[in-house]
Amino acid sequence: MASSSDVRDVLDLPDLEPNDKLTQQPKRQKLAAPVGGKRMDGMQRELFALMGENTPSVSVTKDSHTSLFKDKPQWQAKLTPWMWTPFQNQAREDGLILSHWVRGGELTQGDQYPFAALNTQISFPELTQEDYDGLKLATPGWTLEETRYLMHLCSEFDLRWPVIHDRWEWQTDQDVTMATGETKGAEGTESKVKEEDKDVEMADVKEEKENKDESNKEKSEKKESAPPDGTARTVEDLKERFYNVVSAMSKHPEKYTAEGYNMTTVKFPRDMEIKRKQYLERLLARSPAEIAEEEALILKSRKLELSATKMLQERQELLKLLDAPQPTSSVAQFQTSQGLAHLTSTLNDKSKKGGKPTKEGSVGPQAPDRGGSVEKTTKKEDTKEAKKATKEDKKAATTIAAAISKKLTTKEEAAYGISYHDKLTPGVYLRSSKVTTFKPTIQTKIVAALQDIGIPPKPVMPTAKVCAKFESIQHSMSVLLETKRAADKLETEIRLLRGQKGQL
């Protein structure tokens, strides 16, 4: 599209001055930003349009000036300087001067180093011959000088027993040298001559050893490799000797518990410590196959523990089952909706009557007199035979009523087949169908046990007495099977425990 300058060139018109209003294009006015913040597009705009006038009180959109990260905090406090200051550790004896960074102002070199207080040393009193004899520290294999050497190493290395055992270089010849140190100082010239003679003798011995055969060399090497009596000390020997000396000193607090002495009465279990180390060595010397076998045994033991707890629970349930009273009647008839409805109706009837129901078929004490049924002749023409007949009929009726009103015994009821029921279920049913049944797994075992005895799975003649006996036999069989299962579990566990005990 042609501009105004192009049109003026075509028409040969002069150009406008720069201050002319026609050349000045109007500036676009900036629209005010919406109150809600940035204008939303797409799905957000549609969602806000659905809201209508219910605009949120707080803007959901993010302003452009907000950032995802927190602003840098404006600390108003002044920065604390760090000074490179020399210092001297009072725990050192060589007077070495080091430097370190210290927060704060300048520190003088005379200030105490804060970590020097942590340099604590263990000190023990010097043993003399009187102390050694008074405390009764003389034991076979230990001397006074060797005990002093041990206490010196303990105080120097702060009871770090691996370091003490590594630095232990005591030899039996040192006792003689320490005991005769004073005499050697007086007779210095003689000792020097003797030492020179010893050196010459040792050189001759070395030359002789070099000329020996290989077999003699091996023997000599073995002898040299064997440590002397003083160097054959183990860590347990050193610990035992140290704690015996300390416990003997602690029995005299007036002399050996001054400041600077750390005396503690400790009884060192030497045998237990040796066994513990041997056990750890055996653990570390295990092969991967042995480790896998131990893990498998641990899993088996955990399974046995779980099975033992489960068996205890089952045993408690079985004991409850054995101690529980046996039900006299079956509840199978009340397991259907029809039976429950019938039970509720009977209970409602009993509550309405307000008295106990009488047994069906029973006759009250006031039995009807059958004598009234016999017609009495009022005629005067009755003969004597008719009168006798009426008397006999009356006697028979009274005897029948007395027999009916009489309460029969259990034997008589069983003989005559008389039974009493609180409520008879409606409809016709087979008595054998009312026999209680168990779970399928238990029922099959009960049937198999009955067949072994020679009893069929269902009674052939299901009378009331036979059905009751059959139910009692089934219940006894179920209890017997549960006890047998529990006994088998106990036997297997006893067998496993005996096997584990034999392995140990």
Curated annotation (Swiss-Prot):
<keyword id="KW-0234">DNA repair</keyword>
<dbReference type="GO" id="GO:0000122">
    <property type="term" value="P:negative regulation of transcription by RNA polymerase II"/>
</dbReference>
<dbReference type="GO" id="GO:0000812">
    <property type="term" value="C:Swr1 complex"/>
</dbReference>
<dbReference type="Pfam" id="PF16282">
    <property type="entry name" value="SANT_DAMP1_like"/>
</dbReference>
<dbReference type="InterPro" id="IPR032563">
    <property type="entry name" value="DAMP1_SANT-like"/>
</dbReference>
<dbReference type="GO" id="GO:0035267">
    <property type="term" value="C:NuA4 histone acetyltransferase complex"/>
</dbReference>
<feature type="compositionally biased region" description="Basic and acidic residues">
    <location>
        <begin position="1"/>
        <end position="11"/>
    </location>
</feature>
<keyword id="KW-0227">DNA damage</keyword>
<protein>
    <recommendedName>
        <fullName>SWR1-complex protein 4</fullName>
    </recommendedName>
</protein>
<dbReference type="GO" id="GO:0003714">
    <property type="term" value="F:transcription corepressor activity"/>
</dbReference>
<comment type="subunit">
    <text>Component of the SWR1 chromatin-remodeling complex and of the NuA4 histone acetyltransferase complex.</text>
</comment>
<dbReference type="GO" id="GO:0006338">
    <property type="term" value="P:chromatin remodeling"/>
</dbReference>
<dbReference type="GO" id="GO:0006281">
    <property type="term" value="P:DNA repair"/>
</dbReference>
<feature type="compositionally biased region" description="Basic and acidic residues">
    <location>
        <begin position="372"/>
        <end position="391"/>
    </location>
</feature>
<keyword id="KW-0010">Activator</keyword>
<feature type="region of interest" description="Disordered">
    <location>
        <begin position="181"/>
        <end position="235"/>
    </location>
</feature>
<keyword id="KW-0156">Chromatin regulator</keyword>
<feature type="region of interest" description="Disordered">
    <location>
        <begin position="346"/>
        <end position="391"/>
    </location>
</feature>
<feature type="region of interest" description="Disordered">
    <location>
        <begin position="1"/>
        <end position="36"/>
    </location>
</feature>
<keyword id="KW-0804">Transcription</keyword>
<feature type="compositionally biased region" description="Basic and acidic residues">
    <location>
        <begin position="184"/>
        <end position="226"/>
    </location>
</feature>
<keyword id="KW-0805">Transcription regulation</keyword>
<dbReference type="Pfam" id="PF05499">
    <property type="entry name" value="DMAP1"/>
</dbReference>
<comment type="similarity">
    <text>Belongs to the SWC4 family.</text>
</comment>
<dbReference type="InterPro" id="IPR008468">
    <property type="entry name" value="DMAP1"/>
</dbReference>
<keyword id="KW-0539">Nucleus</keyword>
<comment type="function">
    <text>Component of the SWR1 complex which mediates the ATP-dependent exchange of histone H2A for the H2A variant HZT1 leading to transcriptional regulation of selected genes by chromatin remodeling. Component of the NuA4 histone acetyltransferase complex which is involved in transcriptional activation of selected genes principally by acetylation of nucleosomal histone H4 and H2A. The NuA4 complex is also involved in DNA repair.</text>
</comment>
<dbReference type="InterPro" id="IPR027109">
    <property type="entry name" value="Swc4/Dmap1"/>
</dbReference>
